[in-house]
A protein has these predicted regions:
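Anion-binding catalytic surfaces of enzymes that hydrolyze or transfer phosphate/sulfate esters
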Residues: 198-289, 293
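N-terminal secretory signal peptides
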Residues: 1-3
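Intrinsic-disorder/low-complexity recognition with aromatic hotspots
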Residues: 23-86, 96-98
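Extracytoplasmic mature domains of secreted/periplasmic and thylakoid-lumen proteins
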Residues: 84-85, 89-184
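N-terminal export signals
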Residues: 7-27
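Feature marks hydrolase-like catalytic cores characterized by long aromatic- and Gly/Pro-rich stretches
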Residues: 72-84, 268-277, 281-394
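Patatin-like phospholipase A catalytic core
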Residues: 146-235
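Beta-strand elements within well-structured catalytic alpha/beta cores of enzymes
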Residues: 39-50, 92, 102, 257-263, ...
Length: 394
């Protein structure tokens, strides 16, 4: 059966939604739901390099205000005597006050790379800065779990394409933007007919395999997303819709332990405060609805929401009322099951810089190792090759 270029692109488009659906996901229809009190990780990626110094503000540091005469945050919400949080993240302040938020400062890695693409690859793969890996840290987690577990663990990304973080050597997560749209597309007669009439020896056989996997599983994911309708109101932003999708799946009996979302762009070279405030407002309201939803369903104790960005920004503002690519940054951890709460370590040292950039003190791979071992109950040394200890915030 020959296909035209237009038809090939249609198949490719649907295949991209799953980005090579892993074989283990086919069996998930027959798996039991997550065990009671099973921990769930939700990753929220701040794409573009969020400015950490205008997120957690060193509110009593003269250097900060001197280097950022026009963009320094003057009305931060106090967390400690020395640190405040951006007022657009007012709900994060509420979580902090309730002991449901932790923040780790100065997170990075040796020899940092200021390229968006390369630094994101490093964060996704948990590689060294001079090491190039084709698998992601959560993808290798799937490889490890699916090898030793009777019921394989599933991961889902709410996006059109699958991130490197979720690609393993043998197993990959499943990426989709909207369960209903994916299901409706998979049910089109054209795709079903095409799949029914393909031949194994065709040069595009891999696309047909992916197409079949997507058709078989799109209905299952859509069914689970509709299983327990939420009464919680969510903002109409894209991130609000994405969190609503995640919440609906968590409340169903789908066997999913990792969810991955992203928001951006935080690449604020020009007029930073206006752009960052808009993004933070979207994040603030979406997270507020999601946490309320999880709490009302008795699930918040077992949910860990982790945020990260590929790098921070330079200490000094630029001439365009923005900031340029930097290095170390902070990470947020939100959960009803935190063991250590609040500001976990010292604020950035603005007197000790590396050519105008912050110097990292906490390796992001140690954060990953902590989450893998203490939250997901995985062998972090096998997944990461990390043997330099873990933290105790979860």
């Amino acid at each position: 059966m020959l296909i035209k270029r237009r038809e090939f692109l249609k198949i490719s488009s649907l295949a991209a939604a799953s980005f090579m659906m892993p074989n283990f996901l086919k069996a998930i229809t027959f798996d039991d739901a997550l065990e009671p009190n099973q921990k769930i990780l939700v990753v929220l990626q701040f794409t573009g390099g969020n400015d950490g110094l205008n997120t957690i503000i060193p509110s009593r540091n003269d250097i900060y205000f001197r280097e950022r005469k026009k963009i320094a945050i003057q009305d931060s919400l106090p967390l400690t005597d020395e640190a405040g949080i951006n007022p657009a993240l007012s709900y994060f302040k509420e979580l902090y006050d309730k002991g449901e938020l932790s923040v780790m400062n100065n997170v990075g890695y040796p020899n940092p790379d200021k390229s968006h693409f390369r630094s994101m690859d490093i964060w996704h793969s948990a590689s060294k800065s001079n090491e190039y890996l084709e698998t992601g840290w959560l993808g290798r987690y799937l490889d490890e779990e699916c090898y030793r577990c009777e019921h394989p663990t599933q991961a889902l990304e709410v996006d059109d394409m699958l991130s490197l973080a979720l690609k393993g050597e043998n197993n990959k997560a499943f990426a989709f933007k909207d369960p209903k749209r994916l299901y409706q597309t998979s049910q089109e007669k054209y795709f079903k007919s095409l799949y029914d009439h393909h031949h194994d020896d065709e040069t595009v056989s891999y696309l047909y395999q992916t197409l079949g996997s997507t058709i078989n599983n799109a209905g299952y994911i859509f069914e689970k997303s509709q299983a327990k309708k939420t009464t919680q109101e969510y903002p109409n932003s894209q991130l609000g819709k994405d969190f609503k999708t995640v919440a609906s799946l968590i409340k169903s009996d789908i066997n999913t332990q990792v969810y991955y979302l992203s928001v951006g762009s935080f690449d604020t070279h020009v007029n930073q405060n206006e752009r960052q405030q808009k993004l933070f407002s979207d994040i603030n309201e979406a997270v507020k609805s999601f946490v309320a939803d999880m709490k009302s369903n008795g699930l918040f104790e077992n949910i860990l929401l982790m945020t990260f960005s590929e790098f921070g920004r330079r200490v000094a503002q630029n001439a365009s009322d923005g900031t340029d690519h930097g290095t170390a940054n902070q990470m947020f951890f939100i959960s009803g099951g935190l063991k250590r709460k609040g500001v976990l370590n010292a604020l950035p040292d603005l007197q000790n810089l590396n050519e105008g950039d912050l110097i990292y003190s906490e390796d992001f791979r140690k954060v990953y190792a902590t989450i893998l071992k203490n939250w997901l109950k995985a062998d972090s040394s096998k997944v990461l090759g990390w043997k330099n200890g873990i933290y105790d915030f979860v």
